Amino acid sequence: MDNHSSVPWASAASVTCLSLDAKCHSSSSSCSSKSTASSISASPETQTMRHIAHTQRCLSRLTSLVALLLIVLPMMFSPAHSCGPGRGLGRHRARNLYPLVLKQTIPNLSEYTNSASGPLEGVIRRDSPKFKDLVPNYNRDILFRDEEGTGADRLMSKRCKEKLNVLAYSVMNEWPGIRLLVTESWDEDYHHGQESLHYEGRAVTIATSDRDQSKYGMLARLAVEAGFDWVSYVSRRHIYCSVKSDSSISSHVHGCFTPESTALLESGVRKPLGELSIGDRVLSMTANGQGVYSEVILFMDRNLEQMQNFVQLHTDGGAVLTVTPAHLVSVWQPESQKLTFVFADRIEESTFFLLRDGQSGGGGEKQVQQNGIHWYANALYKVKDYVLPQSWRHD
């Protein structure tokens, strides 16, 4: 017994054998069996083993329950249409990436068109009010040449910083041990002619840390995939990239409706969204176009003070719909008799969209600016580019 007492598992095994053997005894040895059982129950080693066995059974049941939930929960959810995500981490990476060729640009348009990086907004100097909108980039995965010694090459617009950080990650994945090199970003010395997005912090010239020119075609492709709005394989020595201004795309990140926009409650009362409360049941729509009342359970991103750009859609019946450019609008296609969803800023004249009173209409579109409310958290915009198809995103 001394040996058994020094080895817990051996002692427990002996007790278990005694317990099983006691069950096989006749009633004439019941007293000795009971005394053995009492000594067994009093053994701390036995209690420990029973506790371990019970814990293992509980863990096994918990694992089975979790596995069951993982199978059942996806069946309980159904897809829903929501506002289009705006700025994010870039575009879906294609399976086969082809490098750009020298002098190629993507898109094949003028850099200053709205479909590319957009028009110039004005030079930003250190004493300009907009200078505070530039942000420094201290990403350790990016090398900055900073030949001026002023840190100017680290300054850029918020959107440019986002895309550059994504590109830096892609470069490390494509060529382990190689880092992204920024040779020029915001420029205050007017080295780029009279018109350049470098003066606004919206453009960068880039290369790889090893200066291997054979990589630059693929580097340009990675920049396109990272989400830069205009990429040019402008020279054998570097790649040029630029982005839209932060002001032109801010409405894609915040806002959905104005605080004055109203929601129809189940009671029949119209309530401004700025006064909407958790628990209110508002009119919404199912996937097949049926109106249902749904409970408001959460405001994940609500800002009643921030100014944003909105689109106003006017119908021939006099109705006005005010939403952000990336908001999805229910559009009716008479030719195919189908209901689709289109981003608000892509709706054209004579388009039919659904209104609550059953009327449909189409009309002009104009931009307005005021405060807005958004239903979704910013975190969703950080992951949307990796989970949504390109056609679903509002860039």
From Swiss-Prot:
Belongs to the hedgehog family. CDD domains: Hint. It comes from the Eukaryota. The record marks 324 as: Involved in auto-cleavage. It comes from Drosophila simulans (Fruit fly). Interacts with shf. This is Protein hedgehog. The record marks 327 as: Essential for auto-cleavage. Residues 26-43 have a biased composition (Low complexity). Residues 26-46 are annotated as: Disordered. Its EC number is 3.1.-.-. Keywords: Autocatalytic cleavage, Calcium, Cell membrane, Cytoplasm, Developmental protein, Hydrolase, Lipoprotein, Membrane, Metal-binding, Morphogen, Nucleus, Palmitate, Protease, Segmentation polarity protein, Signal, Transferase. The record marks 255-256 as: Cleavage. Ca(2+) 1 binds at residues 147-148, 153, 183-184. A lipid is attached at residue 83 (N-palmitoyl cysteine). Its main location: nucleus. GO terms for molecular function: calcium ion binding; cholesterol-protein transferase activity; morphogen activity; patched binding; peptidase activity.
